[in-house]
Curated annotation (Swiss-Prot):
Organism: Macaca mulatta
Intramembrane region coordinates: 2-13
Topological type in the membrane: Multi-pass membrane protein
Keywords: Calcium, Cell junction, Cell membrane, Disulfide bond, Gap junction, Hearing, Membrane, Metal-binding, Transmembrane, Transmembrane helix
Pfam families xref list: Connexin
BP GO terms, sorted: cell-cell signaling; gap junction assembly; gap junction-mediated intercellular transport; sensory perception of sound
Isomerase found in the keyword field: no
Membrane topology (Extracellular): 41-73, 157-189
Name of the protein in question: Gap junction beta-2 protein
Primary role: Structural component of gap junctions. Gap junctions are dodecameric channels that connect the cytoplasm of adjoining cells. They are formed by the docking of two hexameric hemichannels, one from each cell membrane. Small molecules and ions diffuse from one cell to a neighboring cell via the central pore.
InterPro entries: Connexin (IPR000500), Connexin26 (IPR002268), Connexin_CCC (IPR019570), Connexin_CS (IPR017990), Connexin_N (IPR013092), Connexin_N_sf (IPR038359)
Length: 226
């Protein structure tokens, strides 16, 4: 996957974000995407080739690996990043639509008094208010939901966040209960706990930003004359 393209797209969203949102994007890029691309792939490598079972029965090793690791950690994290990043793109699409509408009205002469030219529309600072506030807030809410959902799926699918050194398997076509060994379990456990911890930090940042937006929205409402 081209993570550079994703970084470029989300980097454009960064200028519409709050200060907390900018911190979230920094954590996403440095502590998740960079770690996933640079380090995690080296740790996992060819997982199935390094999964060893004490049997020569054809197919037993493959079945046992599929039973304990139905989805690769790397692919699950990549899928998580895609889901978590997608709501932020809705904000960029909303801003692009707003500017397109303003350009259309400017060309028609409906708002010529508000802007000197089209370039001023492009460089106008975007404020998180009105319908954009709802889009931005909804995107944060769905980010929290996706983060929490993937953490739950990860915990259930792998029976916790630690990597076992030895797993026992009796699935067909294994002749009996066989012992299977996972390579570099401690190193993988460290990476897994790190990625889960960063997910937790991202959830905390998203919840904090959501509370900040709600408080600002409510305080703005209270200042309006009745």
């Amino acid at each position: 996957m081209d993570w550079g393209a994703l970084q470029t797209i989300l980097g454009g969203v960064n200028k519409y974000s709050t200060s907390i949102g900018k911190i979230w994007l920094t954590v996403l890029f440095i502590f998740r995407i960079m770690i996933l691309v640079v380090a995690a792939k080296e740790v996992w490598g060819d997982e199935q080739a390094d999964f060893v079972c004490n049997t020569l029965q054809p197919g037993c090793k493959n079945v046992c690996y599929d039973h304990y690791f139905p989805i690769s950690h790397i692919r699950l994290w990549a899928l998580q990043l895609i889901f978590v990043s997608t709501p932020a793109l809705l904000v960029a699409m909303h801003v692009a639509y707003r500017r397109h509408e303003k350009k259309r009205k400017f060309i028609k002469g409906e708002i010529k008094n508000e802007f000197k030219d089209i370039e001023e529309i492009k460089t106008q600072k975007v404020r998180i208010e009105g319908s954009l506030w709802w889009t931005y807030t909804s995107s944060i809410f769905f980010r929290v939901v996706f983060e929490a959902a993937f953490m739950y799926v990860f915990y259930v699918m792998y029976d916790g966040f630690s990597m076992q050194r030895l797993v026992k398997c009796n699935a067909w076509p294994c002749p009996n209960t066989v012992d299977c060994f996972v390579s570099r379990p401690t190193e993988k456990t460290v990476f897994t706990v790190f990625m889960i911890a960063v997910s937790g930090i991202c959830i905390l940042l998203n919840v904090t930003e959501l509370c900040y937006l709600l408080i600002r929205y409510c305080s703005g409402k209270s200042k309006k004359p009745v």
